[in-house]
Amino acid sequence: MKKILIITPHYPPSNLAAVHRSRLFAQHLPAFGWEPVLLTVHEDFYEEQLDWNLHKLLPAGQRIEKVRAYPVTKPRLIGDIGLRAFLQLRKRALEIVQNEQIDFVYIPIPSFYVSLIGPYLYRKTGVKYGIDYIDPWVHVFPGSEKILSRHWFSTRLAKWLEPKAIKHASLITGVAEGYYK
């Protein structure tokens, strides 16, 4: 059986939208000859309310690796768990890829910044990776036209980082066709 590493900062007991896509992929991949290894952030670092009933839906014996994240600060400077756990996710992903026979890395986004782990792993190990767009990364936020605003910076940063994330991707999928055109 081939092995796939799924890097998803949120996973049950989180109940965010991206969680369900990763959860269902991981549930059905074994039927197609793929053994999923989930890499996520420990739920102690989630900001959302946890749903332990959702956790009960996970297949018995599913391998889930958890990392820590930097806590949310007051004032809230960085909320995105993909940023708060980026270094920890990247380090653990590299360990898994180097020490196990990982055939593919699947990265559902958001969290958008986690997609940058794909090219890093590719450069370090040659492992192929794919990015699954649940939401578009580059889009205009309300207020993006206001120069030097938070949304202006976010839009510019997304336009600069996204090409770096997808440059060596072997696969790009999306919920809507426009995401990957």
What positions do the PLM features span?
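Glycine-rich phosphate-binding loop signature in dinucleotide/nucleotide-binding domains
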Residues: 96-102
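A short, charged, and often flexible helix/loop element on the N-terminal side
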Residues: 60-91, 146-150
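A short, histidine- and acid-enriched strand-loop-helix "catalytic/donor-clamping" loop
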Residues: 12-14, 94, 113, 127-149, ...
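Membrane-proximal helix-turn-helix segments that form the acceptor-binding/catalytic region
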Residues: 113-116, 120-124, 137, 152-172
